[in-house]
Amino acid sequence: MGYTTYFDGSLKFNKPVEDWLVEYINKFNTTRRMKRDNAKIKELFPDWEKLCFSGNLGEEGEYFIGGLGYYGQGNDGSVLDHNCPAKTQPGLWCQWIIGGDNDELMWDGGEKFYDYVEWLEYMIANFFDPLGYVLNGDITWEGEESDDVGVIHVEDNVVDVEYGVHVHSMSAMDTDAMIKELEKRGYKVTA
């Protein structure tokens, strides 16, 4: 069970992302973000410096992309809480990846992506901005509930969210039907 949200669009980087960062971010995407003990990571994973962001584990192993088991979900000795992310992270899974020609940030297409705006802000603050990468563009979302729609707008790494009507989803409606739908969603429409 859970709640699925669909995304359309991508954010463009100001320059192609270096291969090492693409590899890191896309591995970050495929590992469960669990609260960990940094000392235990260093003890259990001798190559830990290759399994984190620029040799930095961050707080509670937030930058660690190693681990045991499927998608790094195994309960090795470094895991403090399997169902709780590091205190600096918004959730257990980050589903933003770098794609295109290493010049776009986009949804990975997976289901049940929660805290997507918070994850985007986290990635900008922790990975992209410090390395001089700047994102711009729009990504629309549409959740399972009819009123769960909107646009994530990013301009020069500043994230703005517009909740409400996703006009694209109503493009096939005639004017009267669109007005009725908007009023049903609580909007007051005047001509």
Residue ranges with predicted function:
Residues 171-191:
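Short, low-complexity, charged amphipathic interaction modules
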Residues 1-172:
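Acidic (Asp/Glu-rich) sequence patches and key acidic residues
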